[in-house]
Regions:
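C-terminal motif of bacterial Sec signal peptides marking the signal peptidase cleavage site
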Residues: 9-12
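Catalytic toxin/effector domains delivered as secreted proteins or via bacterial secretion systems
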Residues: 211
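Sec-dependent N-terminal signal peptides
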Residues: 1-7
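HKD-type phospholipase D/PLD-like phosphodiesterase module
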Residues: 15-53, 60-203, 217-225, 229-277, ...
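Charge-patterned, long linear interaction tracts outside catalytic cores
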Residues: 315-323
């Protein structure tokens, strides 16, 4: 009461002081990723990403046989960079395929390890640089991957994506389970199929795909559903035309444009929806890739990038052969 009287007389005491407003800080949009298209970008565009590492380079790689890539990793380790590499122990069911790379890297002081048996294959092809950049590849570091295949490389400097990739890497390095963080990074066996089904299900005008394999029934059904609602579906795979499986033939019968493309050989894995959104990553459209492997990719809402990749797929489709 005394306070109220004093406030009325002198304005010296406010029994109900104003509450300071808390500014609402909007969440910043993700940093736009850049997608390189191979073979046009050239091998050096990929190799130079390794050479830029100064503090750290953490890599998961299905197949590593290219001498230039192995030397670049060894050189970075020799310069004091924290180089860690996870290799699949038997890519293409060949237990010796990565052995030479493993031995050379170990001899150069790289922390190199065989991937965990938690996955059928560690088919991911990714690395982070200096805890600041994530590189998601469709290519293996091989002569073919760096020397003529149709491939894609996504360069992603978004801190959320980089942090998610390094969280997964740290767990995979020791074979531990982890909760996969959210964001644009999608992984198998956790989130690739849901991300792809949502991307395909959201298409209204067009879907353009490049894949080595297409056998997953849910993915095939999503593409057939897209055709049924009038979406233009086009896709390429490596061929030859005589190897077209039931899924490719079913899509062709439903009106999709299906082509076997060999110039350049198709090894990239991309899905482009309406030239506005895309997936780029390591996953083939098979149950093994989606359910059993370690795969990594990015789901991007970037119309300019989607249109760029979509134009590449369209060119490959135009140059392909009908099964």
């Amino acid at each position: 009461m005394l306070c109220l009287v004093a406030a009325a007389v002198e304005g010296a005491c406010d029994p109900f002081p104003p509450v300071a407003s808390v500014p609402i800080v909007p969440t910043p949009p993700p940093v736009a990723a850049t997608v390189l298209v191979e073979p046009a970008a050239g091998a050096q565009a990929i190799l130079s990403l390794i050479s830029t590492a100064r503090l750290s380079l953490w890599m998961q790689m299905y197949l590593l046989t290219d001498d230039r890539a192995i030397s670049a990793l060894a050189e970075r380790a020799g310069a004091g960079c924290d180089v860690r590499v996870i290799l699949d122990p038997a890519p293409y069911q060949d237990a010796g395929a990565n052995q030479a790379a493993f031995d050379q890297l170990a001899g150069a002081g790289v922390d190199v390890r065989w991937s965990t048996s938690r996955f059928s294959y560690t088919h991911a092809k990714t690395f982070t640089v200096d805890h600041a950049r994530l590189v998601v590849l469709t290519l293996n570091l091989t002569g073919a991957g760096l020397g003529g295949n149709r491939e894609y490389a996504a360069l992603d400097d978004d801190p959320t994506d980089v942090g998610a990739a390094e969280t997964i890497f740290a767990a995979d390095l020791v074979g531990a389970a982890t909760t996969v963080p959210g964001g644009r990074l999608v992984t198998s066996p956790e989130s690739t199929r849901p991300a792809l089904l949502a991307l395909m299900g959201g298409a209204r005008v067009s879907l353009a795909l490049e894949t080595e394999e297409l056998t997953d029934p849910l993915i095939v059904d999503a593409l057939l559903d897209a055709r049924a609602r009038g979406v233009a579906v086009s896709l390429t795979w490596p061929g030859p035309t005589t190897d077209a499986g039931a899924s490719f033939l079913a899509l062709a019968a439903a009106g999709a444009i299906v082509r076997a493309a060999t110039a350049p050989p198709i090894h990239g894995k991309v899905v482009v929806a309406d030239d506005r959104a895309l997936y780029v990553g390591s996953a083939n459209l098979t149950p093994t890739s989606l359910d059993d492997n370690r795969e990594m990719g990015l789901r991007l809402d970037q119309p300019a990038t989607a249109a760029q990749v979509g134009a590449t797929v369209a060119g490959d489709v135009a140059g392909g052969a009908t099964p």
